[in-house]
Amino acid sequence: MKKVLIIEDDPQIAKIERDYLVVNDFDSDIAATGDEGIRMALANQYDLILLDLMLPGIDGFDVCRKLRETLDIPIIMVTAKQEDIDTIKGLNLGADDYITKPFSPNVLIARVKSSLARYE
């Protein structure tokens, strides 16, 4: 079973993401801050990370930058930031995909599966 780390400070959104992952046979953990997400990502073996950008403390851009120093797994940014400049910045920092909120849970799962397939 593939394992996904959800780094998301909004508990409702994290629950929606987790629920759809579970239904699609993924295991998942949730981190509510950037610092916690970095610690969990480095301490465990995840297959993919769903990363919010607007987090308390360290923002998602800095989390992505830090994780890319050591991890080679898919990172999908899931955020309310809809400006092209944010999308470009995220992709340039090493994100594999960029999804804006509100999102279709079915599209999220399709992108998770697609990103994982590219890393296999």
Predicted features and spans:
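N-terminal/domain-start alpha-helical segments
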Residues: M1-E120
